[in-house]
UniProtKB/Swiss-Prot annotation:
This is Large ribosomal subunit protein uL18. Belongs to the universal ribosomal protein uL18 family. InterPro entries: Ribosomal_uL18_bac-type (IPR004389), Ribosomal_uL18_bac/euk (IPR005484). GO terms for biological process: translation. The keyword Transmembrane does not apply. The gene is rplR. The keyword DNA repair does not apply. NCBIfam families: L18_bact. It comes from Erythrobacter litoralis (strain HTCC2594). This is one of the proteins that bind and probably mediate the attachment of the 5S RNA into the large ribosomal subunit, where it forms part of the central protuberance. Coiled coil: none annotated.
Amino acid sequence: MAKLSLFERRRQRVRSALRKRSGDKPRLSVHRTGKHIYAQVIDDADGKTLAAASTLGAKGSGANVDAAAKVGKDIAAAAKKAGVTTVVFDRGGFLFHGRVKALADAAREGGLEF
C-alpha cells in the first residue's frame, strides 16, 4: 500500500464518515486552492452535480475569506434554485477554519441546513 499524505488520509477519513451518516442527502463539497475556492452540491446516488459556485472569473482575489463567503452565499442560492435545502458538508480534508469556515457559515446564512 502506498504511503498517503496527511491531507489524503484526512480526506479519506472525512469521506468515509460522510458515507456512513449522509443517507440520501446531497453533499456540499468544498475545494480550496491558493488562488480560488470551489463549492458543489453533489447527489452521490445519481452521480450528478446539482449546483456549483466558485471564485473563477471574479474580479479581485479569490483566495480570501470575503471571496469564500460570497461563494457560500452563491452556492446556497444555486442549491435553493435546484430544490435542495438540506446537505451534508464535505470539507474534503481541509481544516474547518478560515476560508472553509467562512464558506460554510455563509451557506448556512443563505438557507442551507447542515
